[in-house]
Design a protein with these regions (language model features):
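Short beta-alpha junction loops
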Residues: 89-95, 123-127
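Intrinsically disordered, low-complexity Ser/Thr/Pro/Gly-rich regulatory segments
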Residues: 88, 112-121
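C-terminal transmembrane module of polytopic alpha-helical membrane proteins
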Residues: 1-48, 58-59, 69, 77, ...
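Hydrophobic, helix-prone linear segments
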Residues: 1-60, 202-207, 211-225, 230, ...
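A detector for small-residue-rich transmembrane helices and their helix-helix packing motifs
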Residues: 99-104, 109-112, 145-408, 413-418, ...
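Conserved beta-strand termini and adjacent loop/short-helix elements that scaffold enzyme active sites
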Residues: 27, 120-125
Length: 515
């Protein structure tokens, strides 16, 4: 036979789940204990309701301590700043001994009392007062017509049935959020990445700066020259097998998750814009030659963060803390390793969040907010495009490295054009002029080569290769005396160089034979 307290127990649960939209966290096998979570994180109070006929207050005290330990452990695992629990006991009678002092103040845990457990006992003699006491913490006043329900037993069964029906429907609705689409574009992007990697390898190597530039890596001078497609192409190129492997695995898992949540069309927009915004920030803030899908993959993180903004409880209950930790580790790693293009990662993260906020989640429409985010995105792109084009970042070392690769492959004209279009930097000016002079020698422009080599020596008097090449030019022109002097200078700087010794010996022998 059902008691008034059973009716009260299920009546309160029904109101919380059906009317107040609370979610069932856990329920005991006998349905006598239930934990409920509020619909928003703004309401930090978790509710635990126990249907148990109390006898002695020391049992009550022990149970309250167990609840406190569980809740504090949960708070620390989820890294919450604070967590409160309304711990409600539904009992036919109060404890037989003195008990009110045990529930008068909340139990607390944590250095700054971050965890609080407010305990209440509602028994047959204080139902209305007990409901009134918990109403200010629950932010609503539970109303249960126990007498009516007791006279109609089916009403109690309907209360129970409605609780679990609504709870199951909420679970089903949440599951549908993660199963909206299928990962079609994810697999297409993976295939493109793999195809481009093999193309790079067969074209000279994916770690070759020249090959990367040829196939569309982010290279600031080329973007400034009008090659706008370099804002998109880098996301499909990878530098070495390990780079490809890490990004492909990340795309497989993250991309699949995001595409299932947002659907294929939205995912395509998010991924492409994140890749673009990652390249844009790298263009504006970094001078390095770069490639990789990392920016677009960070955009997937950004999209998941937006999902967390819309569904915070579900986000933190399923993947939230893991996502935040992975993002934090990756960003810290990027700041500590100079070779990582962290600007691209941050740009992708921001771009993914903004793109997700514009297209929004399926079956979610907030036109005003979407318009605001669209305008924010326009401002974001405009600001960093202005910075990139108005205050361009150059790295002459990249140009010199690529030019050297062209020279090694005897593509002298490509190397010459690249060096001539590279802004001179005092730190690399001597190297740049030396490479230009080398190409000019190969092309037979000895006068230009001579001028550049003399300038190199003025900049760096210890540049031994400049003395040597200049000596070769004078030898070619028949000015053996000047050539001998320059070869001697080169040998003074590097006495053990065989080429320098050989040229010096030849010139000395020629001088002696003439004399």
């Amino acid at each position: 036979m059902n008691s008034k307290q059973d009716v009260l127990y299920w009546g309160i649960i029904n109101q919380l789940v059906v009317q107040e939209n609370y979610r069932i966290l856990t329920v005991s096998n006998d349905h006598q204990e239930i934990w409920l979570e509020p619909p928003t994180r703004k309401k930090k109070r978790v509710i635990r309701i126990l249907r148990h006929d109390l006898d002695w207050s020391n049992w009550l005290e022990r149970d309250m301590q167990v609840v406190l330990q569980k809740v504090d452990s949960l708070r620390r695992k989820t890294i919450r700043r604070g967590l409160e629990v309304v711990n409600l006991y539904i009992s036919t009678f109060p404890p037989v001994d003195d008990w009110e002092f045990r529930t008068k103040e909340p139990l607390v845990a944590g250095k700054n009392s971050e965890t609080k457990v407010h305990s209440f006992v509602i028994h047959s003699e204080n139902i209305q007062q007990g409901l009134s006491d918990i109403s200010h913490l629950l932010q609503f006043h539970p109303r249960v017509d126990t007498d009516k329900i007791l006279t109609e037993p089916l009403l109690l069964e309907n209360l129970k049935k409605e609780v679990f029906t609504v709870a199951q429907q909420k679970v089903k609705t949440e599951q549908q959020l993660f199963q909206y689409g299928k990962p079609r574009w994810t697999y297409i992007f993976i295939m493109i990445q793999l195809g481009m990697f093999f193309l790079l390898e067969f074209s000279g190597g994916s770690q070759s700066s020249q090959v990367l530039m040829k196939f569309g890596a982010k290279y600031n001078p080329s973007i400034l020259a009008g090659e706008w497609w370099r804002f998109f192409t880098p996301m499909f190129l990878h530098i070495g097998f390990l780079h490809l492997l890490m990004n492909t695995v990340a795309l497989f898992y993250l991309g699949s998750a995001v595409e299932k949540i947002f659907g294929s069309t939205r995912f395509f927009i998010i991924y492409m814009f994140a890749g673009f915004s990652g390249t844009l920030l790298s263009f504006a803030l970094s001078s390095s030659l770069s490639a990789g899908a990392s920016g677009a993959i960070f955009g997937c993180f950004g999209a998941l963060l937006f999902f967390g903004v819309i569904h915070p409880n579900l986000f933190f209950r399923t993947m939230g803390m893991n996502i935040l930790i992975v993002i934090g580790i990756n960003l810290l790693f990027g700041f500590s390793v100079p070779s990582i293009d962290n600007a691209g990662h941050i740009g992708g993260l921001i771009g993914g969040f903004l793109a997700a906020s514009i297209v929004h989640l399926p079956k979610h429409k907030h036109l005003v907010k979407q318009t605001i985010f669209l305008l924010t995105t326009v401002i974001f792109v405009s600001v960093f495009a202005y910075l990139g084009f108005s205050y361009p970042k150059f790295d002459p070392a990249v140009s010199l490295s690529v030019a050297q690769e062209y020279i090694d492959k005897e593509d002298y004209q490509a190397a010459y054009d690249l060096l001539r279009n590279t802004s001179q930097d005092h730190q690399y000016e001597a190297d740049q002029l030396f490479l230009l002079s080398y190409i000019e020698i190969k092309q037979g422009n000895f006068d230009l080569a001579k001028q550049n080599l003399l300038t190199v020596i003025d900049i760096d008097p210890l540049y031994d290769e400049a003395y040597f090449n200049l000596a070769l030019i004078y030898t070619h022109e028949g000015n053996y005396e000047q050539a001998l002097e320059l070869s001697e200078d080169a040998l003074d700087i590097k006495p053990n160089n065989k080429d320098y010794k050989e040229l010096y010996t030849q010139l000395m022998n020629s001088k002696e034979s003439v004399e």
